[in-house]
Amino acid sequence: MKVRRIAFQEREGFYKNMWRKGVLSLVTIAIFTAAALAQESRSEISVQGTGFFTKDSNGQGIRQKATDTGGFLVGYRYNLNRWFAAEANYGFVRNTQQYSVPLGISGIQTNVNQYTGGIVFKVPSPVRFKINPYLLAGGGALVFSPTDNSLITGADTQAKGAFVYGGGADYALSNHFSLRAEYRGLVYKSPDFGLSALNTDAVTHTAQPSAGIVFRF
């Protein structure tokens, strides 16, 4: 009987020890899994206020000027690794395209919708500085849509392909929120809204500085 009791106690101690080890293993796995998930917050959503400053263009006896304005830019970025990310953005501004032609000056008030995508190169920086600089390049389209306040009849909505380049920096507020300052340059052909009388056949450039907030998840 004594031998059986000892054997039972040993077996009971063995199972208790195994149970403790199992619980400890599960807790350890849970901790490491949570840490891994926290480190793998690869998606970002950004909302930024922007400026929109377009260079004057000349061609075929026509001078074109776009009024300076402001708007917004929203984006989604997916971090592929510590070096590169892919992003897609939508932006909106409203300005007036002014044309100096032989018969005078005409203007078209325009909603400009921006659809772009690209690759982001993340420049390494010390973690203690909380600043994460980056460079970007890509392409997309600017869609120019005349409003009802346009002074020229017959102007149609027109899309222009655009090359995008730029850079910026994020300042980390926490694991999930950052402040962002960015510059984007847009290179594209000046719009003429399908009217040959307004065609400068010129390439123009828009500077788009911006600042906003980023949510990482």
Spans of features found by a protein language model:
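Transmembrane beta-barrel strands of outer-membrane/channel proteins
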Residues: 45-51, 88-92, 135-141, 169, ...
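Predominantly the C-terminal beta-signal and adjacent terminal strand-loop region
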Residues: 90, 95-99, 171-217
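Cleavable N-terminal export/targeting peptides
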Residues: 1-41
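Gram-negative (and chloroplast) outer-membrane scaffold detector with strong preference
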Residues: 75-150, 206-217
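Outer-membrane beta-barrel translocator domains and adjoining extracellular loop/strand segments
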Residues: 56-63, 98-104, 145-153, 191-198
